[in-house]
């Protein structure tokens, strides 16, 4: 049978989110589809906006610490570390050496816990229910350690301007060493269960590729940038705290696809363990909190400080007018930048690949919307 007219398809609009298990929060994307292929992506954010930066203006410098836990709520210790270090630089406060080591241990444990959520969630997004349980099993061990130290598993409120709130309990060190030893076995399990799985590799290799040049142009940082071949890690290149005392390898990929971003997190957890082990060898007894005023009043001025968070560069810009409350705070969150590259990476892919691409960026809406 012959037809004297051409067959064609019409473009279709699909709302992805804001309440969808694969959006990792209340995030919405509008896909324009030609069949199953995405021809355009529009980011819609703001559903979780809480006015964090404005709230800071009516809180003392110390009172704002718990609010930072609610940014990337999977990386509370890292959020707190970046904030208190910024205030310390502005106020000229020296931190006791033991507190510096405790901060490093807590920060790297938090990095491991954050990466475990990334790995488990991405596996689950690709229908990997069994791997998800393995990753979250090990994350529970980290959260138990955090709870042992500060009494909370996620919103820790542990860092203080001038150190940490209190010293490590006696049972912490043996429990930490046991966990670090157990992780050697876990890495072997990860490889066997999912990383080396042919189906998983088919879903992630060559998917969501972004070049190093484009990654830099979009402002990507952290594992997402290093997966595209850019060798940049603030812990090594602009060391803060006492990171210059530790030997570790900066993991750098080359392919810039979903699989490479996955490998970044696996390998970075191993490096975090190396850092923690070195810190355990070097830490000495001493005070954990400097003598600072109850109401901290930094001199007039402004400062910007950034750290290497679990998802990328986390920065704080603080303006002080000399009183006990910040005049202005701006938070540079890596997830806000990373999600901006999603349309570029998802355009031309299929819907199922877009799920993998979004998961590989590891966004978290508490940090995007603030």
Swiss-Prot record:
Top-level taxon: Bacteria
Membrane-related topology note: Peripheral membrane protein
Subcellular location per the Swiss-Prot or TrEMBL entry: Cell membrane
Keyword Transport: yes
GO molecular function, one term: NAD binding
An annotated GO cellular component: plasma membrane
Enzyme class: translocase
Keyword Disulfide bond: no
Catalyzed reactions per annotation: a quinone + NADH + 5 H(+)(in) = a quinol + NAD(+) + 4 H(+)(out)
UniProt-listed Enzyme Commission number(s): 7.1.1.-
UniProt keywords, alphabetically: Cell membrane, Membrane, NAD, Quinone, Translocase, Transport
Any matching Pfam family: Complex1_49kDa
InterPro entries: NADH_Q_OxRdtase_suD, NADH_UbQ_OxRdtase_49kDa_CS, NDH1_su_D/H, NiFe-Hase_large
Subunit structure, interactors included: NDH-1 is composed of 14 different subunits. Subunits NuoB, C, D, E, F, and G constitute the peripheral sector of the complex.
Entry similarity comment: Belongs to the complex I 49 kDa subunit family.
Free-text function comment from the UniProt entry: NDH-1 shuttles electrons from NADH, via FMN and iron-sulfur (Fe-S) centers, to quinones in the respiratory chain. The immediate electron acceptor for the enzyme in this species is believed to be a menaquinone. Couples the redox reaction to proton translocation (for every two electrons transferred, four hydrogen ions are translocated across the cytoplasmic membrane), and thus conserves the redox energy in a proton gradient.
Protein name: NADH-quinone oxidoreductase subunit D
Species of provenance: Clostridium beijerinckii (strain ATCC 51743 / NCIMB 8052)
């Amino acid at each position: 049978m012959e037809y004297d007219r051409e067959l064609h398809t019409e473009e279709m609009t699909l709302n992805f989110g804001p309440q969808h298990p694969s959006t990792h929060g209340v995030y919405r994307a509008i896909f324009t589809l030609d069949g199953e292929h995405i021809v355009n992506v529009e980011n819609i954010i703001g559903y979780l906006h809480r006015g964090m930066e404005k709230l800071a203006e009516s809180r003392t410098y110390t009172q704002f610490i718990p609010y930072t836990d609610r940014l990337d709520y999977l990386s509370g210790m890292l959020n707190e570390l970046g904030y208190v270090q910024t205030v310390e630089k502005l106020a000229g406060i020296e931190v006791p050496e033991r507190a510096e080591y405790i901060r490093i241990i807590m920060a790297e444990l938090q990095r491991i816990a954050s990466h475990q959520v990334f790995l488990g969630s991405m596996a689950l997004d690709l229908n990997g229910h069994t791997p998800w349980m393995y990753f979250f099993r090990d994350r529970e061990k980290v959260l138990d350690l955090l709870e042992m130290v500060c009494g909370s598993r996620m919103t820790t409120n542990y860092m203080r301007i001038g150190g940490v709130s209190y010293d490590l309990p006696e049972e912490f060190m043996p429990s930490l060493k046991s966990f670090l030893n157990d992780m050697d076995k876990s890495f072997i399990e990860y490889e066997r269960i999912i990383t080396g799985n042919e189906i998983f590799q088919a879903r992630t290799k060559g998917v969501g590729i972004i070049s190093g040049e484009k990654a830099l142009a979009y402002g990507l940082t952290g594992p997402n940038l290093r997966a595209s071949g850019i060798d940049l890690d603030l812990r090594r290149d602009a060391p803060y705290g006492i990171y210059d005392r530790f030997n570790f390898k900066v993991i750098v990929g080359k392919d810039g696809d979903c699989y490479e971003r996955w490998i970044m997190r696996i390998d970075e957890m191993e490096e975090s363990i190396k850092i923690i082990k070195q810190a355990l060898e070097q830490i000495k007894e001493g005070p954990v909190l400097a003598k600072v005023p109850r109401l901290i009043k930094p001199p007039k001025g402004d400062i910007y400080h950034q750290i290497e968070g679990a998802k990328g560069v986390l920065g704080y810009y603080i303006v002080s007018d000399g009183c006990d409350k910040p005049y202005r705070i701006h938070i540079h969150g890596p997830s806000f930048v990373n999600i901006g590259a999603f349309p570029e990476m998802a355009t031309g892919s299929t819907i199922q690949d877009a799920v993998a691409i979004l998961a590989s960026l590891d966004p978290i809406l508490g940090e995007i919307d603030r």
